[in-house]
Amino acid sequence: MPARWIRLGSLGQREFDASCTTLAAVQSRSAAPILVWGEEAARYPFALIAPLKFAPGRKDRWLSWGLAAAVATYRQFEVPAYLDGEIYLHGRDIARSTVALIGECAVISSSFLMRFPQRCVATPSFELEQAFRLRLEAQHGWSFDSSWPSGAEAVSLAARLPSPA
């Protein structure tokens, strides 16, 4: 099953969330799932945007469905993160995860720490992205292609940007 991986680059959380909302709102029922990846000062925010046909039937299952691969990725890097309604490490909430229904899509947003506590060095985005991508592909049976927003998506995203002063 084809899926899309869209890198938004360096954005503040507000802009990242607004972009994900916009992307989700313009997806059809038959759209391919999308993983949106961003970069912030201390985190790598991400959002899984999936038409409802891919998500579990009950909304209360979406979080674990959407974040299991993130927890597996942390563990691949020997970080003992776990999922308990949120991603935790040593009893501390380390992500700001949300679940939403936007248009025809389930949207599960969260983030990875940029610096893993045991190592206290920045984890390269590329290595983390690749590990996460492989975990998502294995879990869901998807095959990601790097993607740019489509024409309609780009127009919608541009409409959300503040005008230059």
What residues fall within each predicted segment?
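N-terminal lobe of the biotin/lipoate ligase/transferase fold
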Residues: 1-64, 68, 158
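Hydrophobic, Leu/Ile/Phe/Ala-enriched alpha-helical segments that form helix-helix packing faces
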Residues: 26, 70-75, 132, 136, ...
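Short aromatic/hydrophobic-glycine micro-motifs
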Residues: 31-32, 79, 141-142
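Short, structured patches in soluble enzyme cores that scaffold and shape functional sites
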Residues: 48-52, 70, 98, 110-116, ...
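A contiguous catalytic/ligand-binding core that recognizes phosphate-bearing ligands
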Residues: 52-91
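A contiguous pocket-lining binding segment that forms or flanks enzyme active sites
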Residues: 75, 79-122
